[in-house]
Regions:
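Short helix-loop boundary/capping segments
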Residues: 153-203
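Extracellular/lumenal glycan-associated surfaces
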Residues: 95-101, 146-160, 227-240
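Hydrophobic h-region of N-terminal signal peptides that target proteins for export
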Residues: 9-18
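Extracellular structured ligand-interaction cores
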Residues: 69-71, 90, 137, 147-151, ...
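Short, flexible domain-boundary/linker segments around small modular repeats
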Residues: 104-141, 186-221
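Sec-dependent signal peptide recognition
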Residues: 2-10
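Solvent-exposed N-terminal domain segments of exported/luminal and surface proteins
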Residues: 21-134
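Long, compositionally biased interface segments
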Residues: 200-259
Length: 259
């Protein structure tokens, strides 16, 4: 069985003319294909969204959206295991072929101009939603990596608004990703001052500013829970928004670093 979706994507692009940056509305084509085999669910995408985006490049995100070659497969019949796998790169793929990459490549670095860098203290990883300017995230909670890849860090607002179903995509272990507005994670912000690392209150700048207390056991620490009797992941309005760990066997295709 094979599904092929070719959807027109309207994106804002920017060009530089005589030193002035101007914006124009350009029409690009989103190409996304999902194929089912006996045991795998595979995706092909050119990385272009099927909805409007923010303006890129810009001061807070100097990268331009460009075509990508995304070719990934996950298990068609995922199984939940007893321990989870921490995700620091690609977590999943949306139903329009755009990847979910909730983490950043930034860590606390007191010697860096913005107090964080790629070579900082790995014990304190930056959460994009805790940063001023959010590294240029647009209204879809997405921005562009150095390689031109447009990717989601949170709820893909325009994609969700175009659909009347809760299914948003698939995780790297094959489980479904859903969004239901009332779902809340069991993660909360710590109180008081940090005992080490960056000086100051726990304010959400770093992922380590949060801890998991559970939410009446509805969602686990990976934002996973039951929907109609089956285990799925949820995107939530509160931290971590997009799951940072997975409870199934993660496909090797999702271990590749994409920035």
């Amino acid at each position: 069985m094979k599904y092929v979706l070719n959807i027109v994507a309207i994106t804002f692009l920017s060009i530089n003319i005589s030193g002035c940056v101007k914006s124009l509305l350009a029409e690009e084509f989103n190409k996304f294909e999902m194929t089912l085999t006996d045991d795998k669910r595979c995706f092909l995408s050119n990385g272009l969204p099927n909805h409007k985006t923010g303006k890129f490049p810009k001061k807070s995100n100097p990268n331009s959206i460009s075509h990508q070659k995304i070719d990934v497969c996950v298990s068609r019949y995922p199984k939940k295991v007893s321990t989870n796998t921490k995700i620091t790169g690609i977590m999943g793929i949306a139903l329009n072929g755009i990847l979910f990459r909730p983490s950043t490549a930034g860590f606390w670095d007191p010697n860096a101009p913005r107090n964080h860098s790629r070579n900082g203290d790995k014990n304190w990883s930056v959460d994009i939603f805790g940063l001023k300017g959010k590294l240029g995230l647009d209204f879809n909670n997405a921005h562009v990596g150095r390689g031109g890849m447009y990717h989601y860090h949170g709820l893909p607002t325009s994609l969700v608004n175009k659909s009347n179903k809760s299914l948003v995509g698939y995780a790297g272990d094959g489980f479904e990703i859903h969004y239901l507005p009332k779902k809340m994670s069991g993660w909360v912000l710590k109180k008081g001052l940090r005992k080490s690392g960056p000086i100051g209150n726990y304010d959400g700048t770093y992922n380590e500013d949060y801890y998991y207390i559970g939410n009446n056991n509805e969602l686990d620490e990976c934002n996973g829970g039951l929907l109609n009797g089956k285990y799925v992941y949820f995107i939530t309005e509160n931290y971590p928004k997009v799951p940072r760990c997975l409870y199934g066997e993660v496909s090797n295709d999702f271990n590749k670093s994409r920035h």
